[in-house]
Amino acid sequence: MSVTQRWVRGEISNFQYLMHLNTLAGRSYNDLSQYPVFPWILSDYDSEELDLTNPNTFRDLSKPMGAQTPARLEQFLKRFREWDDPSGETPPYMYGTHYSSAMIVVSYLVRVEPFTQQFLKLQGGHFDLADRMFHSVKDAWLSASRNNMADVKELVPEFFYLPNFLLNSNHFELGVKQSGLRLGDVILPPWAKGDAREFVRLHRQALESDYVSAHLNQWIDLIFGYRQQGQAAVDAFNLFHHLFYEANVNFEAIEDPLTKNATIGFINNFGQIPSQLFKKPHPVKRSLKSTLPLQHSISSNAACAVAQQGVEGPTAAGPLFYHVARI
């Protein structure tokens, strides 16, 4: 039985399945430019209590981040329709930035090593302007889903198992925003009660919820499946700059060293689409209530245990894995 069939039957968790797909698609904890990518799953970062029975709590998993609001999508479509490259080298696209890149990864994880040093390396030895640093989960969501035309980023796996990355335990001087706010720990939504462990517990519980389980196949179609490229990507408002697609870049055919280096730099800095794993619509997961064994259900105690495992951090043998194998 394939891993996909096991997931459809409810024998493995959504987290486990996403990690499996990322690995098959060439994503690795050891490569910041092709780091594992996970979806934004929630849209409610204001409520005091998180209601996982309300569909409005969740992000629309059938649409990429650039299409979460009609107004912003229209701006991307306008660029796509009106695109005109006299040289003919760059075909029309909707999104000129990517949902996963080295800079996105280290920006999310800047408060924990070794990502702090990697962030400083990419930034020329200093932290970014405080107003551009990751400092609030809600603000990051609004930027990626609504407010910023240059931001369509998704998440990294650590959002679902590692409370440490939300805490400035090392007391880094991250700067002061124009509003006067000094950056420290990441500002959490009210339902997290100011507790990074509680945020991770509820976020992981949301990932394994009935709603996400019933719609995760749609996000898989966008990132790893048939809606990743071609006409299906156009129809799903999921078309990125052509250099983000591995099949569109043939380094052997680029004779000019400057052009080759520029292309390599573009991919390293702005990210790359994962390898395509599925050519047909991904099957839907069956109802958890009827298929998921008790030991795979997410309870408060189990989720807290996940958070406890994540806190241990990296080991010498696996510097970037944070004990994911135990989850």
Which ranges hold each PLM region?
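Charge-patterned, phosphorylation-rich low-complexity C-terminal interaction regions
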Residues: 291-327
